[in-house]
Amino acid sequence: MDNGESSSTNNSSRPWESYNTVFTNAKAGMEGVDKEKVQRVVYEMSKGSKYFQNEERKEALMKQKIEHMRDRCAKLSSLDLSNYQKVVDKRILELEATRDLSRIWLHVDMDAFYAAVETLSDPSIKGKPMAVGGLSMISTANYEARKFGVRAAMPGFIARKLCPDLIFVPVDFTKYTHYSDLTRKVFRNYDPHFIAGSLDEAYLDITEVCRERGLSGGEIAEELRSSVYSETGLTCSAGVAANRLLAKVCSDINKPNGQFVLQNDRSTVMTFVSFLPVRKIGGIGKVTEHILKDALGIKTCEEMVQKGSLLYALFSQSSADFFLSVGLGLGGTNTPQVRSRKSISSERTFAATGDERLLYSKLDELAEMLSHDMKKEGLTARTLTLKLKTASFEIRSRAVSLQRYTCSSDDILKHATKLLKAELPVSVRLIGLRMSQFVEEIRNSDPSQGTITKFIVQKDSSRQAQDLDDNDSFDLDANKNCLSNDESGNVSFGSHETSSAHLKDVVEYEERSQIDSGKVIPNQECMKKEERLQILEGDSLLKKYKECKPDTSHSMNDNSNATEAVSVFPQTEPLYWIDGYKCVLCGIELPPSFVEERQEHSDFHLAQRLQNEETGSSSSTTPSKRRILGKEKVNSKPKKQKPDQKDSSKHIPIHAFFTKSNQNSNETQRK
């Protein structure tokens, strides 16, 4: 009793000890940092702010998930666990059969890339603590600054508090892109088909180079790092292993300017991963780490195998497969098939402001940048999406279907201005623009037919009768878990995104509903609001809560051009897949590992809704409210109708041939 009182008193007098954010997580070069001091400073500087309130909300949701997971775990009987262990044993044999130790993968990561480039440009700041960014947000920090606890994605005013002598250098993406291109010239000498994770990292399959030249993976890594330094004057670190997942982990071991080689031997790999903290794995972020550790007692990768029965009992099969693969040291070994781009975007983070002139100026810059990138890649698109992050960290998205395909900065700015105007007045800390629905997609395929051929519906009657609460799943791409930056890359200052290669925490960005006895957990803020139709970024889909009214507080002005159908969806919740694999809108089943297909499926629903709105705006009849596979397709040339099809509006929609799950029955039967 006394111990409990003492602990409670200690927590109230030292509240920062329980305050964990992305800023308090160690990166390379932060090993000797006084973590308690960093926690205290971040806590004191953030307390009472909108960011602080948002972090508290997320912390409460995370604790709720942990308690929910504990409750479910406690309900499992020994017989349940025994049956799930049989599943685990069988799955281990199947996964082991896929182990490939014949490939040699190299992951190369530039050392504090932005900061290193700036130091190269201005040698006077060499050896001094510096950060790229400003007082509102920093993109990265050099190793001298990291010793004080300064790191990427940290507000500059907090970084200045931690390190009073910190030097700020403004972001210059033109410069970083130039040096990135130089490094990639070197990479192509070793693997013409290397995978670029971002501007400053890449994955190379060096199997053939090693075989042809009779060199080991370590020797090739040493040579490549030397070549990068000769070409750019910048240092990099490398990891060599049998697959991409392990290679990425290895590249972080001897940072900066070092390398680590993990031999292609099963026993060596198993020993390596046995004591590896789960947080070291790409795709496992703060939320997943805490759920695994606090709810299931899993701290290391080895324990994922030891407690595999719990994972398969409590998570979706795809998520459990990922965790089990990690515990076995398995990862991607084949070069992923090149896929066509589905969208292209640019965004900027800055100090929260409601100054309309400044916001329009930022929008102008983004339109120019996006147009430049599209012209560079020969792209024209028709769907424009505006993304806003408000001062209170609420994400809002607006989309418009343009009258023609374009890559013109004037066209982009014209429509983006209308979208922004509809949101004003608002205080914003991030603006982003994205173009999707490229003309190539329309010319080369029928959207509806393409979806049917790619997404085969496989129904499991036992799953249909299962309550959502019985299968809490996590979204992630098991094949691409090592193809992304640290989660902080998604909140870096002035990020310039032209691809969707960012993998987020497998739990933190899946705020899907947890259902207990038919009731939604009450603490989720969005549940208390009126229904909002949402268009979400990345691989997100439209989400709908039943028996609520639409929120029209952010709708477009009545004087909007009728031919430009605008959809307004404040983004307050991430994607929603029933049982972790079933689209809530149309019932199509897509495993979490199909990240690109989910993105395309999301874009299809968005485009279809915009098309329906366009049709409805020119028709006197009330448009259908069903958000399912559409009745029309977008094409530059009208498709010829069959002789017996006199009225295209009377055709039987393709979705009528598919059986919907119980969760979607109300949606699809509504007229």
UniProtKB/Swiss-Prot annotation:
Bias type Polar residues, positions: 659-671
Positions annotated as zinc finger (UBZ3-type): 576-613
Biased composition (Basic and acidic residues): 629-650
Site location (Substrate discrimination): 114
Tissue: Expressed in roots, leaves, stems, flowers and siliques. Present in endoreduplicating cells.
An example molecular function term from Gene Ontology annotations: single-stranded DNA binding
Keyword presence, DNA-binding: yes
Intervals of motif Nuclear localization signal: 625-632
Stretches for region Disordered: 607-671
EC assignment: 2.7.7.7
Cofactor: Mg(2+)
Protein family: Belongs to the DNA polymerase type-Y family.
Function: Template-directed low-fidelity DNA polymerase specifically involved in DNA repair. Able to extend primer-terminal mispairs, and to insert nucleotides opposite to a single 7,8-dihydro-8-oxoGuanine (8-oxoG) lesion and moderately extend from the resulting primer end, thus leading to both error-free and error-prone bypass of 8-oxoG DNA lesions. Probably involved in consecutive DNA replication cycles in the absence of mitosis. Binds preferentially template-primer DNA substrates or single-stranded DNA.
Protein name: DNA polymerase kappa
Species this chain originates from: Arabidopsis thaliana (Mouse-ear cress)
Gene: POLK
